[in-house]
Amino acid sequence: MKRNLLFAAVALVALVSCKETKSPFKRYVDNYAVVNIEAPDLSGITDNGKEVLNLYRFAADEVDAIYWEQYFGDKQSLLDGIEDPMQKTFAEINYGPWDRTTGKSFVQGYKDCPPGAGFYPADMTAEEFAAWNNPDKNSPYTLVRRTADGSLETVWYHDAYSSHIEKIGNYLKAAADITIKPSVAKYLLSKADALKTDNYYESALAWLDMDDSKMDLVIGPNEAADDQLLGIKRSYEAFVLLKNQAHTDELMQYVSRIAEFQEDLPGEPAYKTFQPGAGSNIFSCDALYYAGKANAGIKVIALNLPFDADVQRERGTRTILLENVIKAKYNHIVGPGGEVLLEPEYAAHLSPDAFFWNTAFREVAHGLGVKETIDGKGSVEKALGSAAVTMEEVKANTAGVLLVCKLQDHYDIHHIFTKEDALATFFASLVSSERFGEGSSLGRANIIIYNYLAQAGAFPRKASNQYALDFQKMESALSDLTALVLKTQATGDKAFADQFESQYSKLSSNYDSDRRSLSLENIPADIRFSFQH
């Protein structure tokens, strides 16, 4: 009898477990491998410094709340209305009811994501926006809303999110009061003012000047990738970072060669005229915390900021490599994914060092090329509109790996890995990242590059269903594509950019096969974080 009861209990547990794991959203959640961001080694940080880090995280949490409102709306209402725990987790990963890889709704009662996300009225068209006469509409820091009579109006970010911004300002001022670094205090106070006025010029300069701190805080509305209607409005995000000084010193030797890297890019000299200021730097950091746009969907592994072309021209940019996140992406996705996708001869060239350097120079490439069109159409961002972000991602990815190949030609980093390692690792990352989908500018950029290289015969598919690589054709095609994008940006040719993106951003016939191969080996599409409190 006891034995029968035991079997019944086991059967009941099995039944309950089966029901718990039957959510159709489990496979979507499992596509994001959990990465634990451990508590950092703070042995070299003073007690004041540790408290500054805590205040940075509190400020980042307020940014997270802003981003939910900005991109979607009422977070709690959405989550409270979802009963399936896996579906709720997927909504938390995506910061809303829309799968970021497709833009499609996965929650009943919500339509697909509008191209302008929460920045504009869902029913506003690009034509209506263009015809609307408003001096603030093109600011990256205004929302567009409908009034009671159906007309459009702008609302400044600092007004729309004033209660959160006041709290952020208080945290930043408190951190400024206790830091022992004058450069840090200056930056934090400047950023607090900038968030209250949506004027970020002075705070961007102060941030670039803050190069003597072991800690960094990137905070504010930075990137416009969420605005797929017009490519104007920027999303709030925050990164709390701890600098790896040894790796930073190693990377900084390349900063003085920015002009040389500009010359190394393919194409006409007129299409690569931008000269960033002499204050550029490269930091290698461990990420301690992501919030807002940074933590939504696909996780970035490096930054190149600020985006303000005037600041870039006057002072330069800061490239930040998120070292622990780069390692996590390689170990979970790029390395094992490459072993699945590439024939053994080419998989032997996969290299975590190559992935790190490819990432570094992708971010350096963001600061190269042109920022203003050469024929009077204004900034590249303005001239290319909704195509600007995707074209910029294509340029950075292709130009970055080309610059790494140039360094190999010069024997700068030949002792660490080979040119073939750089190209094979780039390809493995490219195919794995196609799964970011057509719903994001980064996903579309990867699809465009894949299709362009395929057209050039750079990676024949073998009977094994794995890829072989023609390194010479790959490097040549990457050069041609980089030159084409630089020309498109310099001439502000929106018609061509739209046509080119439409032609090349369709998933290839190989995509389903590659996705299946990666899925069968449980290779995730991306990662999500579990932060140590």
Language-model segments: residues:
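C-terminal motif of bacterial Sec signal peptides marking the signal peptidase cleavage site
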Residues: 14-17
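N-terminal helix-rich structural modules
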Residues: 22-188
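Active-site recognition of the HExxH zinc-binding catalytic motif
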Residues: 46, 354-371, 396, 401
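Contiguous, non-catalytic segments that form substrate-binding/exosite surfaces or channel walls
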Residues: 157-347, 351
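An active-site-proximal "capping" alpha-helix that borders the catalytic cofactor pocket
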Residues: 181, 389-407
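Post-HEXXH active-site segment of zinc metalloproteases
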Residues: 370-394
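Long, well-structured alpha-helical subdomains associated
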Residues: 401-499
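Extended, compositionally biased alpha-helical segments that mediate assembly or anchoring
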Residues: 485-533
